Amino acid sequence: MKNYIINDLDDNTMNSSRKARNDVFIFAKQAGFKEILSPFIIHPQDRSFKAKLQKLKYSKITIPKLLKNANDADVIVFQYPMYSTFLMNHLIEDIKKDTHAKLVYVIHDIEGIRMFDDTDNYSDNELRLLKQAGGIIAHNQPMTDWLKEHGITVPIVNLGIFDYQNPQLINQNMDYNKSVVFAGSLEKSTFLTKLNLKDTKLTLYGPNPADHYPDCIQYEGKLSPEELPKKLTQNFDLVWDGDELDTCFGTYGHYLQFNAPHKTSLYLSSGIPVIIWKKAAMAKFIEENHVGFAIDNLNDLECPCANHG
């Protein structure tokens, strides 16, 4: 059987989301998948006439040429979604038209869940694209259930947790000082501005910090996915989202009930236990595998830190 994976990565735009896609590509290559290199290098926010012409060239010339080199494919793995809906539509249509391969999606995000906490407002176009798959690798059972509830009937398997390419050795001599780290896009983590910890220090990494944080929080800047593991020396890592301390509320908080954040994989690959919202989809994995703790309320954050030294 000849298996291919599409590589739509741009090394010049590596960030946390690109890290997740790059890791999937690396592990697929290690498993013997061949590469279909798709050089779609256009900034997602570029609406210029030049960008439109470039997309047209990609759709009419580049994509068909790429698929000619994979006309013997039995399986083509596609990382969903791409940044450009226009190119994603053309790529999927051409794979279906020009090859006999089974098209398998590895889901990174589903915008119908991520951007709308009212699931009646899901995108018809997104569901149409998802229905084009021959198979889907979803994050977990809650995401699979959502897909099925919205009419997706193709075979679906659950990933559970993303693998994480982490060359950094695990620190075997870590001091216990009730320390916690949080990494991510800080503009969507406004709960941090409300946190009041007495005996625990929280270290932050990520872009777009707030103008001010409480004294219990120390902001250490933005690091690349390659540099960040070198700095993870804390006792616990936090997975939380939204505006509130007593729940993961709002669009991003709601999404935690369905997705498997790549940062969870970063933390565990660094040998650090995770503290996560009890209603998050990943909470069951964390507790069943004894790799952290699930809590209902961030006001309880200091309890596992104090009791599990």
Report the location of each language-model feature.
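Nucleotide-sugar-dependent
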Residues: 229-270, 276-284
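N-terminal pre-catalytic "stem/leader" segment of glycosyltransferase-like enzymes
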Residues: 1-91, 96-104, 113, 277-282, ...
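A short acidic/histidine/glycine-rich donor-binding loop in glycosyltransferase catalytic cores
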Residues: 289-295
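A short, active-site helix/loop in glycosyltransferases that binds the activated sugar's phosphate group
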Residues: 115, 131-156
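Conserved donor-nucleotide binding/catalytic region of nucleotide-linked donor-dependent transferases
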Residues: 303-309
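Membrane-proximal helix-turn-helix segments that form the acceptor-binding/catalytic region
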Residues: 67, 94-98, 118-136
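Conserved catalytic-core segment of nucleotide-activated headgroup transferases in glycan assembly
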Residues: 164-233
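Alpha-helix capping/helix-boundary segments
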Residues: 83, 142-144, 187-188, 274, ...
